[in-house]
C-alpha cells in the first residue's frame, strides 16, 4: 500500500505557503496548506516538509503518518485556527500527541489545563507533609550484647542486638553511611533503601518503616508532627511493623509507648519516650518467619502460618512461644485474641490475664468453635456489643472459610459454658474469603476474586444482632488492586485495602489500582461509593498507606479526626483529612473554572516560555521553584508601551516616569506630556514571522496569573 520515499523524491523542502499538502494519518486523509503546517518552528511538520525527516507516501502520493487520526483532527484544527476544540479526545492523549508533533504552544496550553486541578500543595484534603528523614549509620559488626533481666525472681538472659543506644562503649557503634548495597527482600529483588515500606499509627503516634530502619512521629497540638525516634540501621529489610501508644497497667514507667519491627523470624522491640528518644527492650525469636505482628493491650503478639504464636508481656517481660494448629487468620477485640486455623477451629486467648498455666508453662489457648464443614477459617472478625448487664458482653464473631462461606456465630455472656451458636450462613463467594468485618451496622466480606466485596445491613435490637428482619444484602463490588511481580510497588503488608475505621463508624477501603500508582481512591466499605481520591503532591508513587484515628484536641468542641497516611517511594509521608472528606460526602463540588472554560479563556492569549526580561504590567514573577508554563512577554514585545502610538519616548522623560525625581516632578512631567499619554497606549504592530501564518487576530502573551 505504502511506498517509502525520501524528501528529495517527495515533498520539496521549500515551496509556496499556499501549497496544498495531502496527509494520510492512520489511514484517514487530511488536506491542508504548507502555511498551516509550518507556522510553528522546529515542529514535526516543519522538519518533515523541510526534508530533515524522511517521508513515507501511500499510493496516492499523500504523506503517511502512523498516528491516531482521531487525535490528529483537533491538532490540525489548532494549527488552522489557533483554537483548541478537543472534540471528545481525552486531555492526556491530546497532550501526548502534541508533544510528539513538537507543537510547543499547544503543549503549554494543555499542560496548563492539567494544572487546573493539580497543585504541589495538594487539595483541601491535604493536611501535612513530612520529608524523608536522615538515613542512620550502619554498625560495623553484628555482635550481640547480653543484659540481665529479671523473670520470676531470677535473672534470665535476653539477647540484645546491635541496636542498643550508643552508651555501652565505642566498639562498633559508629558505622559507614548508607553506601552499601541494600540486601534483597524475601522475594529476591533488591529494595529501594529510601522507599517507605510500612506505615502504622496509634492515637497521636506514627511509625514509618523504611527498608532497614524505622522512625516514629508524635503529634503535638501546638507544633504538629515531630520526629521523636529513629532506629539504627538493621541488617535486613523490615517486613512487619507494630505500634502501641497507650499501655494500660504497664510496668514500664515512662516508657509506655512501644514500637516493634520484624525481619524474618527476629522481632526487635523498643520503648519510646513521649519527649523524644527510645531504648531497646530486646530481640525475640519466633523460630519461623513472622507473618503478623500486632499489640493487644500491653502484649506483643507475633504469629506464623505454621501454627506458632509468640506473646511478650510488658509487665512480666516474658517471651513465650506456643504451638497450635496452622494459623490462617486472626482478630482481636478488647483483651480477646482469636486465631483461625486451617482445620476449621477458632482458638481463644485472653491476653489480659496471666497467660501461663502454672504446671506446664503453656499459654492458655482454648478451642472456642469448630466450623461444621471443617473448612479452613481464612478471615476473622469479632465484635463486642456494649455491656447490657453485669455478666459481660454479647460476643459476635463473623468468619470466612476457604470454600467461600461466610458465617456468623454469637455467644451470650450467660451461656459461656455452652460455646458460641451458629447464627447465620452466607454462601455468596466462590473463592476463599480473605477479609471480613462485622461492625455495628454492616457485615462486609472480601474474597480472593480480585477483591470481590459483598456487604449486608445488620439489624440490631438493644445492641445485639437480631433475626427480625435479619441481615439483608446491601452491595456487591470489587476493589481491584494489582500487586507487583518484582516487589517494587511496595511491601504487600503496607498496601492493605482495609476496611479501616472504628466498628461503630463508617469504614472505608483504600484502593491502589496499580503498584506504581501515585493516586489512591477512598471508598465506603458498605456500598463502594467513592469518598475521595488523593494524588501524591510530589508525583512520586505511593508505596504504603494506612488510616489513623487521631485523638481530638483539648479545645472545646473538638472531636477525633481520621487521617489517611501515604508513604511515598522517595521516603516522604503525606497526610490527608478523611474527616473532611466524609463530611462532604454527597455534596456537589463548587469549583472554579472547568477545563472547557479555561480553554475558552486561553483562546485570547498566547502562552510563551519563561524569559529573563523584567516583568511588565506590574506583575511579579512567580516564587514557585518549578518552571512556569508561561511568560509575561517575549523578546519581541520589549518595545516601550508608554510611547504615543508606538513611538519611543524621550529618554529623560522616560527615566523620570520610571522613578526619577520627586512625586511632584513626575506629576508635572505627565501634565507636560500632553493629554494623549493618559489614554491607553496603542500596541506595537504584531511582528511578522515571515512564514505566512494563518489569518487569525493577534493574541497577547499573558502569564497564567493574569486570569
UniProtKB/Swiss-Prot annotation:
Recorded name of the encoding gene: SHKBP1
Task: State the species of origin.
Answer: Homo sapiens
What family is this protein classified in?
Belongs to the KCTD3 family.
Q: What is this protein called?
A: SH3KBP1-binding protein 1
The principal localisation class reads: other
Keyword match NAD: no
Name the SUPFAM superfamilies on file: POZ domain (SSF54695), WD40 repeat-like (SSF50978)
- Tissue specificity annotation: Widely expressed.
The cellular location(s) given in this protein's UniProt record come to: Lysosome
Q: Name one Pfam family in it.
A: BTB_2
The chain residues annotated with the modification N-acetylalanine are: 2
Amino acid at each position: 500500500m505504502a511506498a517509502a520515499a525520501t524528501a528529495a523524491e517527495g515533498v520539496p523542502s521549500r515551496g509556496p505557503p499556499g501549497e496544498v499538502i495531502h496527509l494520510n494519518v492512520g489511514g484517514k486523509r487530511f488536506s491542508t496548506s504548507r502555511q498551516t503546517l509550518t507556522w510553528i518552528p522546529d515542529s514535526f511538520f516543519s522538519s518533515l516538509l523541510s526534508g530533515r525527516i524522511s517521508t513515507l507516501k501511500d499510493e496516492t502520493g499523500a504523506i503517511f503518518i502512523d498516528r491516531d487520526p482521531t487525535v490528529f483532527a483537533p491538532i490540525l484544527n489548532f494549527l488552522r485556527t489557533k483554537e483548541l476544540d478537543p472534540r471528545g479526545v481525552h486531555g492526556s492523549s491530546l497532550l501526548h500527541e502534541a508533544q510528539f508533533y513538537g507543537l510547543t504552544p499547544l503543549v503549554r496550553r494543555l499542560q496548563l489545563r492539567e494544572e487546573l486541578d493539580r497543585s504541589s500543595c495538594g487539595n483541601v484534603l491535604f493536611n501535612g507533609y513530612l520529608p524523608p528523614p536522615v538515613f542512620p549509620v550502619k554498625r560495623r559488626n553484628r555482635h550481640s550484647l547480653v543484659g540481665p533481666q529479671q523473670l520470676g525472681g531470677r535473672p534470665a538472659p535476653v539477647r540484645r542486638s546491635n541496636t542498643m543506644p550508643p552508651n555501652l562503649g565505642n566498639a562498633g557503634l559508629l558505622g559507614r553511611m548508607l553506601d552499601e548495597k541494600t540486601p534483597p527482600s524475601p522475594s529476591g529483588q533488591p529494595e529501594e533503601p529510601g522507599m517507605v515500606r510500612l506505615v502504622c499509627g496509634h492515637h497521636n503516634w506514627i511509625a514509618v518503616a523504611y527498608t532497614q530502619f524505622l522512625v516514629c512521629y508524635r503529634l503535638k497540638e501546638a507544633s504538629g508532627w515531630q520526629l521523636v525516634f529513629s532506629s539504627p540501621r538493621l541488617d535486613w529489610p523490615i517486613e512487619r511493623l507494630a505500634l502501641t501508644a497507650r499501655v494500660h497497667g504497664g510496668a514500664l514507667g515512662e516508657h509506655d509507648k512501644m514500637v516493634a519491627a520484624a525481619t524474618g523470624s527476629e522481632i526487635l522491640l523498643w520503648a519510646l519516650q513521649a519527649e523524644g528518644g527510645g531504648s531497646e527492650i530486646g530481640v525475640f525469636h519466633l523460630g519461623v518467619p513472622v507473618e503478623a505482628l500486632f499489640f493487644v493491650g500491653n502484649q506483643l503478639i507475633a504469629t506464623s502460618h505454621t501454627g506458632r504464636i509468640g506473646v511478650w508481656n510488658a509487665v512480666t517481660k516474658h517471651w513465650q512461644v506456643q504451638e497450635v494448629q496452622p494459623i490462617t487468620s486472626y482478630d482481636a477485640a478488647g483483651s480477646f485474641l482469636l486465631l483461625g486455623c486451617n482445620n476449621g477451629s477458632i482458638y481463644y486467648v485472653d491476653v489480659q490475664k496471666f497467660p501461663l498455666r502454672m504446671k506446664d508453662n503453656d499459654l492458655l489457648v482454648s478451642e472456642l468453635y469448630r466450623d461444621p464443614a471443617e473448612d479452613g477459617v481464612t478471615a476473622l472478625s469479632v465484635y463486642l456489643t456494649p455491656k447490657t448487664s453485669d455478666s459481660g458482653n454479647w460476643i459476635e464473631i463473623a468468619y470466612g472459610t476457604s470454600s467461600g462461606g461466610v458465617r456468623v456465630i454469637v455467644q451470650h455472656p450467660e451461656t459461656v459454658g455452652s460455646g458460641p451458636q451458629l447464627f447465620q450462613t452466607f454462601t455468596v463467594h466462590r473463592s476463599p474469603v480473605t477479609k471480613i468485618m462485622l461492625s455495628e451496622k454492616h457485615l462486609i466480606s472480601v474474597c480472593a476474586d480480585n477483591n470481590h466485596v459483598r456487604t449486608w445491613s445488620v439489624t440490631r435490637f438493644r445492641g445485639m444482632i437480631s433475626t427480625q428482619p435479619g441481615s439483608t444484602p446491601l452491595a456487591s463490588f470489587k476493589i481491584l488492586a494489582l500487586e507487583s511481580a518484582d516487589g517494587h510497588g511496595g511491601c504487600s503488608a503496607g498496601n492493605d485495602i482495609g476496611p479501616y475505621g472504628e466498628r461503630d463508624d463508617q469504614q472505608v477501603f483504600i484502593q491502589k489500582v496499580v503498584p506504581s500508582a501515585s493516586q489512591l481512591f477512598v471508598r465506603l466499605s458498605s456500598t463502594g461509593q467513592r469518598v475521595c481520591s488523593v494524588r501524591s503532591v510530589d508525583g512520586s508513587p505511593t508505596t504504603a498507606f494506612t488510616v489513623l484515628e487521631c485523638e481530638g484536641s483539648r479545645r472545646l468542641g473538638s472531636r477525633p479526626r481520621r487521617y489517611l497516611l501515604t508513604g511515598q517511594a522517595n521516603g516522604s509521608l503525606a497526610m490527608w483529612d478523611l474527616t473532611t472528606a466524609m463530611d462532604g460526602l454527597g455534596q456537589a463540588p463548587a469549583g472554579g473554572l472547568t477545563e472547557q472554560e479555561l480553554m475558552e479563556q486561553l483562546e485570547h492569549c498566547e502562552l510563551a516560555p519563561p524569559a529573563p526580561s523584567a516583568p511588565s504590567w506590574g506583575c511579579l514573577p512567580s516564587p514557585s521553584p518549578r518552571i512556569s508554563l508561561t511568560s509575561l512577554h517575549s523578546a519581541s514585545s520589549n518595545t516601550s508601551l508608554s510611547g504615543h502610538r508606538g513611538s519611543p519616548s524621550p529618554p529623560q522623560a522616560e527615566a523620570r516616569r520610571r522613578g526619577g525625581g520627586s512625586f511632584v516632578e513626575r506629576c508635572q512631567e505627565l501634565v507636560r506630556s500632553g493629554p494623549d499619554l493618559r489614554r491607553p497606549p496603542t500596541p506595537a504592530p504584531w511582528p511578522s514571522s515571515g512564514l505566512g501564518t494563518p489569518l487569525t487576530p493577534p493574541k497577547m502573551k499573558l502569564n497564567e496569573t493574569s486570569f
